Each structure stands twice: as C-alpha cells, then as structure tokens.
Swiss-Prot record:
UniProt-recorded name of the protein: Guanylate kinase
InterPro entries: GK/Ca_channel_bsu, Guanylate_kin-like_dom, Guanylate_kinase, Guanylate_kinase_CS, P-loop_NTPase
EC id: 2.7.4.8
Cited HAMAP family: Guanylate_kinase
Organism whose genome encodes this protein: Syntrophomonas wolfei subsp. wolfei (strain DSM 2245B / Goettingen)
Subcellular location: Cytoplasm
Length: 195
C-alpha cells in the first residue's frame, strides 16, 4: 500500500538536543530523508552542494524569496538560510518522509505554509538542565546563554502550534517517543493512498 510522504518538523529551544535527536533519527529510521537548506554562506571544507546545503549567491536567494520558493527563510548575521519548498514537496509527492530540524520561528513559518506537517516540540526537563547543556557545549558566552534561556521561556508561548511535546530528559527516551510518533503518523488513514 502506498502512502503520502509526511513532513516531520522538530524544533525547540537552543541547546535542547535537536541536532543529536535528528542524527539518531536519521541513523535508525527507515525511509526518513533530511531536508536540505539553501544558504548564501560559502561552503566549508568538506561540505558538498546538494548534500550538506544548496549553496547559492545572494542574488539567487533573493530571487527565490520573490518566487516564494521557500517554506521558511531567515537572515543569520550576513548570511541567508532557507528551506526550499520544491525539494520538500518533491520528496513528499514521491511518498518519502522528510525530517526538518529548525528553530521555533522557522517552524512557525513552515506551519503557515504546510499545516499538514507533523510538528514536534523538543523541550528540556527544566531550565536548569538547559543552562547546564548550553554551558557544557562550550560554544556560548554567559550573556548568550542568559539570552537563550530568556528566549526559551518566550518560545514556550508557541507550544499550541505544535502537535506533540517531547521532553528530552534522556536521549534514548526522547528518541523512543519521536519514533512512536513517526510510526503512528505513518499508519494514519489520512496518510495512506487507499485507492
């Protein structure tokens, strides 16, 4: 029996473990394809166009914005990043599921354009644990950590836009819950091509 492809969106506050969960899901979940973003930043050593990112120049990216070619896009410092609509739709139309790991603002943009997606909010067990994770990864200044924690409280206000909440207290337990969500969504009648 054929079924429609499903867009699975995981998002949550910075430092909650989205990247770790994404990698584990892709490693262990059959027929789950990663959404590839477009960016104007130069490719780093070892990055491959079409595998890590779609690398485009500013003019091309702006043209794609004008053509409504993105499910979402954002400017991060001097670079632009976006999720190409065509890439995602092509996979979905071929019955392939797509996983998109994104920040909360991006997820809200995607929800507007693709409300049929499955939106999963990843949340820490508490703010103290999130602070510990942010400090432990050693990538952020104290000011940045405090700003991220303040943003986390604000981001919780958007929880109603999501279909599921998964608390990432233990990576294996969170992974098990997301896997259960994927299995259940794949079995829903609305996602099956019955004719």
């Amino acid at each position: 029996m054929n079924r429609k492809g499903i867009l699975f969106v995981i998002s949550g506050p910075s430092g909650v473990g989205k990247g770790t969960l994404k990698k584990a899901l892709l490693d262990q979940t059959k027929d789950l394809n990663l959404s590839i973003s477009a960016t104007t930043r130069p490719a780093r050593l070892g990055e491959v166009h079409g595998q890590h990112y779609f690398f485009v120049d500013q003019a091309k990216f702006r043209e794609m914005i004008e053509q409504d070619a993105f499910l979402e896009w954002a400017q991060v410092y001097s670079n632009l990043y976006g999720t190409p609509r065509g890439f995602v739709l092509n996979h979905l139309q071929q019955g392939r599921d797509v996983l998109l790991e994104i920040d909360i603002q991006g997820a809200l943009q995607v929800k507007e354009k693709m409300p049929s997606g499955v939106f999963i909010f990843i949340y820490p067990p508490n703010l103290e644990e999130l602070a510990f994770r942010l400090v432990s990864r050693g990538q952020d200044s104290q000011d940045s950590i405090e700003a991220r924690l303040a943003a986390c409280e604000n981001e919780l206000k958007h929880i109603d836009y999501y279909d599921y909440l998964v608390v990432n207290d233990k990576i294996d337990r969170a992974l098990q819950k997301i896997t259960a969500i994927i299995i259940a969504e794949r079995c829903k009648i609305k996602n099956l091509n019955m004719r």
